[in-house]
Amino acid sequence: MDRAQKQESIESLKSVFADAGAVVVTHYMGLTVAEMTDLRLRLRKEGAAIKVVKNTLALKALDGKLGDKGDKLFTGPVAIAYGPDAVSAAKIAVQFAKENDKLKIVGGVLDQTNVLDEAGVRALATLPSLDELRGKLIGLIQAPATKIAGVLQAPAAQLARVFNAYATKDAA
C-alpha cells in the first residue's frame, strides 16, 4: 500500500468515524468467509456495514482523540461495524457475537471521542433504535387523543341505541 492509498484509506475512515453514531470494534479472527458474509448481510439490512481496517490507519483517522484507550482498542485483527445511528451496528454485532464465539467485541467509539469497553457496547445494544423510540413517542402522543375521541363518541352511541330500542319497542 503506497502513501496515496494510505491517505485515501485514512480519509475514508475519517468520514466513517464522523458519520457513524457509534463504531463497534471487533476481533474477527477465525470467522469463515460465509460467516463474515452473513454478518455483512445482516448489517446491510439495517443500513450498517463492517470493514476490516488496518490499526495504524484507524488510529491516524481518529487523530489521537482517544489517547491510550484507543491504542488498546486497535490491536490485532480488527474490523469495525458502523451505521447511521448509534444502536443498529452494536445490536447486530452483539447478537452475532452471541451466536458465533469467533467474533469478539473489543469495544467501541462513540462520537469520535468516547471509548466504550465491551460492556458499554453490550449496554448500547440493549437500547431501542431511533425508529423504535419515534414509534413509542407517537403512540404516547396518540393514546390520549384516541381515548378522548372514544369518550366523546360514547354518549352519542348510547343515545342512538336508546332510540333504536324505542323504535323496535314501538314496532313490536
From Swiss-Prot:
Q: Which GO terms describe its biological process?
A: translation
The lineage's top-level taxon is Bacteria
Q: Name one GO molecular function term.
A: large ribosomal subunit rRNA binding
Q: Name one GO cellular component term.
A: large ribosomal subunit
- Provide the transmembrane region boundaries: none
Please give the function described in this protein's UniProt entry: Forms part of the ribosomal stalk, playing a central role in the interaction of the ribosome with GTP-bound translation factors.
Q: Which family does it belong to?
A: Belongs to the universal ribosomal protein uL10 family.
Q: State the protein's name.
A: Large ribosomal subunit protein uL10
What phylogenetic lineage does the species belong to? Bacteria, Pseudomonadati, Pseudomonadota, Alphaproteobacteria, Caulobacterales
Which gene is transcribed and translated to give this protein?
Answer: rplJ
